[in-house]
A protein has these predicted regions:
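Basic, glycine/proline-rich low-complexity segments that contact nucleic acids
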Residues: 4, 8-100, 121-200
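Short, flexible active-site-proximal loops enriched in glycine and acidic residues
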Residues: 98-105, 114-117
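Short, structured beta-strand/loop micro-motifs enriched in basic residues and often containing a Trp
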Residues: 108-115, 133-139
Length: 200
């Protein structure tokens, strides 16, 4: 017996499908909504095959049990630094990444280079992005923390300038800007901790 999608899914919000409680196993169940994503192979140079170690160490002995098998996956190379300053880019597609919980976006920059970035929630194909000191305060733009208004939510934050984003990178995670000092910004982490990071 087939169950229609309308009966199965209660609602779709925030890229999540919530199932109706048709059985005890379905109650509170939700999965990522992949209907709005682009399918296809990643461009050459932005993908590579990672070797599966199947729970073995360098001596070949099993150190983690029950690992191995599964579907083969291609690793997408993500640009966490986004250091193409003052070069506008256009979002070509928003895609699923099997190695992370967040969706990723393929960006075509004006100089012809393509890169993957982490996709914020409302970023769509065709949107324009920019990394700049003077970037407008819009979704997908990247600018120093000192220019972001207090109370705003940010993601993919650098701990040290130039090292690439390392804070709030997984799906649904964000930090909140609490205060800006001379060279530092106070951020409220996803854990609730308040941390001081460089504002450049």
């Amino acid at each position: 017996m087939e169950i229609s999608a309308e009966r199965l899914y209660g609602n779709k919000s925030n890229n999540m499908k919530k199932y109706k409680p048709t059985s005890p196993g379905r109650r509170q169940m939700s999965v990522s909504d992949l209907s709005g994503l682009t399918k296809g192979n990643p461009p050459r140079g932005l993908r590579k095959r990672l070797k599966s170690h199947a729970g073995r160490n360098s001596q070949g002995r099993i150190t983690v049990r029950h690992q191995g098998g599964g579907k083969k996956r291609l690793f997408r190379v993500i640009d966490f630094k986004q250091n193409k300053l003052n070069i506008p880019g256009r979002i070509e597609s928003v895609e699923y990444d099997p190695y992370r919980t967040a969706f990723i976006a393929l960006v075509l920059y004006k100089d012809g280079e393509r890169r993957y970035i982490l996709a914020p929630e409302e970023l769509k194909a065709g949107a324009e992005i920019l990394t700049s000191e003077d970037a407008p305060f819009e979704i997908g733009m990247r600018t120093p923390l000192r220019r972001i208004p207090v109370g705003s939510f940010v993601y993919n934050i650098e701990m040290f300038p130039g090292r690439g984003g390392s804070i709030a990178r997984s799906a649904g995670n964000f930090a909140q800007v609490l205060a800006n000092e001379k060279n530092h910004t106070h951020l409220k982490m996803p854990s609730g901790e308040v941390r001081k990071v460089f504002s450049e």
